[in-house]
Amino acid sequence: MRVVRSQFRGCPRNCKRRADIEATERERSGRRWRPRPASQETGRRFNVTCGGGSAEDVILQVPHTDSAVTVAEHAPRRRWPVATLALFSLAALLAVLSLGAGPVALAPDTVTAALFGAGTEPHRIIVQEIRLPRAVLALAIGAILGLSGAALQGLLRNPLASPALFGAPQAAAFGAVVVIATGLADALSFALPVAAIAAAFVSVFVLLAVAGRNANLLILILAGLALSALAGAGTSLAVNLAPNPYAALEITFWLLGSLEDRSFQHVALALPFILAGAAILFANRNALRTLSLGEEAAQSLGVDVGRLRLAVIAGVALGVGGAVAVSGTIGFIGLVAPHLARPLLGYDPARLLLPSAAIGAALLLAADIAVRLIPATTDIKVGVLTAIIGVPFFLYLIVRDRRSLTGGLS
């Protein structure tokens, strides 16, 4: 049972003033549900956007037995800025620690001196040219993966959604693999990331051409799965047809996902796409919040649901494509980060975006530090470590939510 009451002020789309949108479910006994007194409301208040006007005082009343994810705020508003600042501070701390972690351990004072141009020449090279670009990329890539995961889970209203759902990361990996297999990566230093980003864009255009602008979520997901399978088959074919074993080995290592041997050239190439994708996703935060009320309610509040889907998919493809272009395939960060943010900040999709980005950055930085410190005969790739940690967590989510997931996608 769910009741939504909204009061509209100044909406240019002919919304009724003080209109009540009610979505009710009959109880098993057949009795009509009656609103509870205000003192017994289980939801909290928050603001949503209705076209050019505003819809204020939206209240969700959900019985305690309802296990569905709702947009009711389960955490006080004042907790959001403090928690978000704390999470970003944690990510920044891990970034600083990553500058000193590695085969050559550096003390904090040595790292600080080398960072500002003092200290010995070897220390400056290690910090400024080797570890600093790696830390910046880990921050940016982890943040866009966490942000994309939170946005997609809000769009689909499904806790198992991840950035790989619509095929952009797989297409980016296929583009990079083709460049490696043909030898262009050795001839042109920027050929690999440019090909990966271009392939991600092509996958989005094909997805939109196949599914159409007003396609529902099921068609978009099916088209995305088909593109993912096609990109995976193309990647396997490129490995199979590699001209020599060394090219096949290079492709395999790249697909494992890593931040090793990255420079500020990679940062300069990937960061604009990551920032552009993040800006698109963050600009649609209020529409994602409204969509949590349901598609019909969101449309009545002035949200163009079809445009919202296209914007979120394009933002995810743009940001994740830029990330995959320089790091390879790194999975499960986008799936795990929003779930770690929800116990702290509730289920409001708009308020989960920034905390999920901070948690994603912290997770990838922690994984990158761990692969440097784990004793092994060869370097463990960061994508392997995130998969080892992420797969059990994914299975746990399936077991926990299998009852609610049996209903399928609406």
Tell what function each PLM region has.
Residues 19, 23-24, 38, 42-43, ...:
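Ala/Thr-enriched low-complexity intrinsically disordered regions
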Residues 46, 50-410:
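Alpha-helical transmembrane segments in inner-membrane proteins
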Residues 8-11, 28:
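Short linear/disordered segments characteristic of secreted peptide precursors
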